[in-house]
Design a protein with these regions (language model features):
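SAM-dependent methyltransferase catalytic region
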Residues: 5-251
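Conserved AdoMet
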Residues: 1-2
Length: 251
């Protein structure tokens, strides 16, 4: 009854799998030069379909699978991302040959490919737990679980503001700076900050030391703030951004 009041409904596994497979097929058709029918056969049945993939194109196919980005804006209990985790895992196992670590492939997919948001904290906790359990079942020796704080987050994906800051206005910054002849400098700074954030997030994902995690959270917060400030040419937006501590809001 509570789920109905919130507009939350259970999606049958068959529907989840169908949607995940069709999404993956559409992505691979767009990002590889492999024939559509061969892509479809491969995704629907990797062990049989891989036979029709030319050897010379398999590295490109594997790279596309490793680079895909998936975001569920209303993740709920994580059914759709878990479905895509299984589809990606199956495809990558077949392309990896005989020597591969199933748990490590799962960790790689969760770290590099999957993101999710939900307005309900309980849903976020359940989704994170499902991903952790999916790793544990394939590990012979238990290892520290990855930190999913920046992978699956609580928030409202229907609005474009955070802590009173209208983030939609930041998208106009590039055009604004282009008009002022500052685009090259802006792009260089943006790329540098993006690389810094990516490096920090990668370190945080596998960090198990509490003090180090707290320090990394603050460094991530500072780097993201700098990136947002670089885009905020409006003085009022800039002032609001400086008041936000992302590390505190992520706890």
């Amino acid at each position: 009854e509570d789920n109905k009041d919130k507009g939350a409904f259970y999606t049958p596994k068959e529907i989840v799998r169908y949607m995940c497979q069709e999404s993956l097929i559409a992505y691979l058709e767009t990002n590889t030069s492999i024939a559509k029918e061969k892509i479809r056969q491969f995704v629907l049945s990797p062990e049989e379909g891989v036979v029709g993939i030319p050897e010379i194109k398999k590295p490109k196919l594997l790279a596309a699978l490793e680079e895909v980005k998936i975001c569920d804006p209303a993740i709920g209990s994580g059914a759709f991302p878990m479905g895509l985790l299984n589809e990606l895992l199956h495809c990558r196992e077949v392309l990896s040959g005989e020597h591969y670590d199933r748990a490590e492939i799962k960790k790689s997919i969760i770290q590099n490919n999957i993101y999710g948001v939900d307005i309900e904290k309980g849903a976020v906790d359940i989704a994170r737990l499902r991903f952790w359990l999916s790793i544990v079942v394939d590990e012979e020796t238990p290892s520290p679980l990855p930190n999913l704080d920046y992978k699956i987050m609580q928030g409202n994906s229907l609005i474009e503001s955070f802590m009173g800051v209208d983030l939609s206005k930041l998208t106009y910054e590039k055009e604004y700076k282009k008009d002022k002849g500052e685009i090259s400098l802006f792009d260089d700074e943006k790329n540098r900050l993006q690389k810094t954030v990516s490096h920090l997030l990668s370190s945080y994902y596998s960090c198990s030391d509490h003090d180090r995690k707290v320090k990394l959270q603050q460094e991530i917060s500072n780097s993201i703030n700098k990136q947002l400030e670089a885009q905020a040419y409006n003085p009022s937006i800039l002032a609001k951004l400086k008041e936000i501590n992302l590390a505190e809001n992520n706890k």
